[in-house]
């Protein structure tokens, strides 16, 4: 089917769905049709913009050929033709991008996990910096950032930390943050002024709902124990800490942040559900491994994706060769959009080239 034929088919489907919704259907049929109609809305707007510009260009070219025009009118028509000829490829690209297969998880909220990697206490301090950076970015985007768990070192660093980030299309924006983030800076305790390199790992998981992942009680082993502080001492006299193991996969989540065992269990289940959903997605993607060759990075947590060099004031994303000399804006204020938009655009370009 040609590109033009495909556009006609989509417009026809959208029109028929509109008529169907107006006919008084109810129940599951109405819900299904409403969902399909809403999913087509964005691409239909882009198709109509493309068709309008294409029609206007054709009319302008015909007018130029068929009419006797004075110089002023001819110049005006030529300018209009030039503008439309530049606009049309951009509108066509926008249509093609909107027709790309959608990641079913893109519209979901996300769970982000940050873990200190190599580099000792400096790595833990960097993990805290990253976690706070994502919190600032979430506030900037108007998302709700809920801390799930923090394992701190007692002097400002985080061994690991996780949060739930709720909002529209959160996962689509943050999914490229998964991987190894490296920092180069001079630690406050470094008397010789030497630059140290350390790392932290970020994992971004789509937040799963009950309809995405069904967890049977028989598949869970739940252990409770007393919460301990940074030095290992017990900080609670009740068994409020919870460790949940999903027996079929061996995936384990332990949580002790809340004083309530019930709250710790609820948060642990949320993280477990997200990890199981991500594992399900990973297996599906492995089956379609050929389609992943063109993506920007693999999302592999072992892949080094970005370097934060404090002495030089730069942040470099190695997947798209983008360097910004604005480390304070990025790290302290969470201004990540320039990286995120470039990563999304590059991913779309790779996918378009594979069509």
Curated annotation (Swiss-Prot):
Pfam families this protein is in? PCRF, RF-1
User: Which GO MF terms does the UniProt record name?
Assistant: translation release factor activity, codon specific
Disulfides per UniProt:
none
Report the InterPro entries cross-referenced here: PCRF (IPR005139), Pep_chain_release_fac_I (IPR000352), Pep_chain_release_fac_I_sf (IPR045853), Prokaryotic/Mito_RF (IPR050057), RF-1 (IPR004373)
| Intracellular or extracellular location(s) | Cytoplasm
- What gene name is listed for this protein? prfA
Keyword Zinc tagged: no
Compositional bias annotation for Basic and acidic residues: 280-293
Q: Which family does it belong to?
A: Belongs to the prokaryotic/mitochondrial release factor family.
UniProtKB keywords: Cytoplasm, Methylation, Protein biosynthesis
Q: What does this protein do?
A: Peptide chain release factor 1 directs the termination of translation in response to the peptide chain termination codons UAG and UAA.
Stretches the record annotates as Disordered: 280-310
The primary site where this protein sits is: cytoplasm
Q: Which residues carry this modification: N5-methylglutamine?
A: 233
Domain of life assignment = Bacteria
What post-translational modification information does the record give?
Methylated by PrmC. Methylation increases the termination efficiency of RF1.
Q: Which organism is it from?
A: Rickettsia prowazekii (strain Madrid E)
**Protein name listed in UniProt:** Peptide chain release factor 1
